[in-house]
Amino acid sequence: MEVRASSSFVRTFGRRLLSPLALSSFLLFCVSNPALSQEPRIHKPPTPEPIEVTELPLPPTAPSSDLGACSTSINPHQTGCIDTAPLSFQSGSFLPDGDSALARVHFVGAPAAPDPASKYDGGQIIIVKADGTKFSNGDTWKCVTCGVPPQNAIGVGPDQGYPQSFLDGKRILEGSSIVDCSPYLLTDDRCTADRVHIYPIRWNIAPDGSGPGGNIRELRLHPDNVHLGFNGMSIGKDGFGQFGYFGRLVFNPSPQSGEPRAPRYDLTHVTRMVRQGPPAMTLERDPEHSDQLRLNFDAITVGEFRGFSKNGREAFYIGYPWESCNIDVFAVDMTTGKIRRLTSNPEYVDPLDSSPDDKWIVVEDTRGSDRQMFMAGMRGVPPIIDLLATAYVSSVRNNGPRRFFQAYLIDRYGDRGNYQGQLLTSGDGAPGSISDPNWNAMADPRWSQDGTRIVFWQAQVTSPSCGGSNPLPCPAPSEPGGRHFRMLIARFTSRIPLSVKPLAPVSDDIPWGTPYVPGTPLPKFTPIPEGTYTMRGKVAGSATVILKDGDDHRGLKRVYVSYKDYSDEPDCIINGTEEVTRLSSYSPTVFALDWHSNLVQSGKTQGTKITSSDGFKTSIDVFSNIFEATGTLTTTINGKTYRQPENGD
């Protein structure tokens, strides 16, 4: 039951002993092969622990975005009102003291200038009290970037995503900029708008150092606070591509080249997270048998960089799947290149953060929603059709702006047997509760420095992901002012606070990576030549694989696989066929497929993966994520059937 605290802004959802996620028992089956697990299955699952979830206080919501709508009757302190839209908000990290956390908000309804309250307008970074106290003005929040003079923010772009505090408590990484209030702490009353400077981050991609630099996204601060990781994206006639990068932040007070010619941070000693030479692939042609395919679990395939371990030694990433249609998070040692598979649940996982001692991770995952199970529910199938299907599969996880994530606590050794992590927001699913399925976790969750708390946020489903032609009705708003988001803290009440020493700066070099040289072309993966191949099961059986290129100069067009008693582990056998053909699309970000499956699984798991007689024809844009298909793809495991979403759902 929800318990309301004395403050109208604070809600405590109660303390519960949350059991590990009770997913279908089939998760026990067809996943014991050590090659498919990040650690040998010898570690006893952890005991469930008590978790208390509390909602943090946010600024009041404005009744509209009209000029002056944020009146003194709504906010007597005249410190701003925020929008209600779910994507107008994003929680960030804790500040180093653990008493406050960062958030990105969108202020609306401010009065016109010269009213002092006019500065509470547009996208801004705020600090939210997490310890029940208030700032000196009586608010539980403080806007750091509101009213910063234009001359203090030259060349700064609009991106304010994923706000992360530096350990000095004086700086914030927001989007592709750094907010700096030195010499004062961000929480200090002396940290006022006129003392704040916002510096853009520039990645030089031109041989002569000219221009504005390259586009960088999904920035994550390294624990040494000297380096950061980021993603660089390319969209062109050859399709959609992305690479992860690692570089050093260097403050440049007076740039002599490039734009902007204003104080900024430059990224130096940049390394692309790709092995030098032709990039390796998880599915590859056997170098000793050119007519055979094999799985190379040592291949580093950083599809999207997602962060770092707290000891600074590993980079986290979403990579090419180790099982068909199963998108997981991996960790790669930045010195040795050794890979760990952090998750193996067949659902989609993306946002994550590691605890200060690296004994736990918090992930946001679609597990429990069955969103991906119609594609990924059959375990032990090698990732062969994924040569064409991976981008499509990963894009089904969302319905437009809606995510189907929930937050889970997982120990270092990952998913194994019946242990599939501990859900942070367990409950009865009542409307408006933290377990309401119409409220979903959003990126990124963040640990406190002492390892006893996680800050994260949820968004409520809104149109167009519900209502209208969508089969899901839109739920009524349950938050103050009708906002569709909330900022939460999960407290691990039985844990003893950790004391973690600051990390010394790590090396600029990634020995296995490729040093970035401005102006050089992106690396190209060497595709497996078209032809007919055999892939042998590790235990028994084989698969016949036919790869066929298209005549549109875009490479692979068709993948056909026929399984004959294929088995990568004892008593887990795959028979049948799968075929995926790439269809023409109007955009490089749209993936259209003609998919045919007729698989049967036998042994300790009984299952089928079957398409309708005319196949499963489907397309999706990797940015808009709207599901559309004709025909059906259905997976049944041990009597439980998983079906695709409805179109537009």
Predicted regions and their residues:
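Small-residue packing motifs within transmembrane alpha-helices
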Residues: L18-L21, D353
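Bacterial N-terminal signal peptides
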Residues: P20-V31
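N-terminal secretory signal peptides that target proteins for export/translocation
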Residues: M1-R15
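Sec/Tat signal peptide C-region and signal peptidase I cleavage site
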Residues: N33-S37
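Sequence signature of WD/YWTD-type beta-propeller architectures
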Residues: Q38-D649
